[in-house]
Amino acid sequence: MLKPLGDRVVIELVQAEEKTASGIVLPDTAKEKPQEGKVIAVGTGRVLENGERVALEVAAGDRIIFSKYAGTEVKYEGTDYLILRESDILAVIG
């Protein structure tokens, strides 16, 4: 299990559409980079200058939208994940 540090979050990516609305199959090179994912794990929070730790606003299980080029892609046990900072998360879905 991946356990992020500090204000980082581990995201499982929601895969891009394989076909367009009109039924055209898209090759991998034409697919949009995903911006939606499911939070798998969260870090312990960020530390303020006074040493106080602030908990993250997202939790495991949340579906989120994040910045297009945010984070670092990693592959762990055959699954693709993205590790990013909480500040790169734009919204929680639902």
UniProtKB/Swiss-Prot annotation:
Role, per record: Together with the chaperonin GroEL, plays an essential role in assisting protein folding. The GroEL-GroES system forms a nano-cage that allows encapsulation of the non-native substrate proteins and provides a physical environment optimized to promote and accelerate protein folding. GroES binds to the apical surface of the GroEL ring, thereby capping the opening of the GroEL channel.
Family stated for the protein in its record: Belongs to the GroES chaperonin family.
Species classification: Bacteria, Bacillati, Bacillota, Bacilli, Bacillales
Keyword Cytoplasm among record annotations: yes
Keyword Nuclease tagged: no
An example Gene Ontology molecular-function term: metal ion binding
Compartments, as annotated in UniProt: Cytoplasm
Biological process according to GO: chaperone cofactor-dependent protein refolding
Source species of the chain: Bacillus cytotoxicus (strain DSM 22905 / CIP 110041 / 391-98 / NVH 391-98)
Annotated protein name in UniProt: Co-chaperonin GroES
TM segment ranges: none
Top-level division of the source organism's lineage: Bacteria
Keywords noted in UniProt: Chaperone, Cytoplasm
A Gene Ontology term for the protein's cellular component: cytoplasm
Subunit structure: Heptamer of 7 subunits arranged in a ring. Interacts with the chaperonin GroEL.
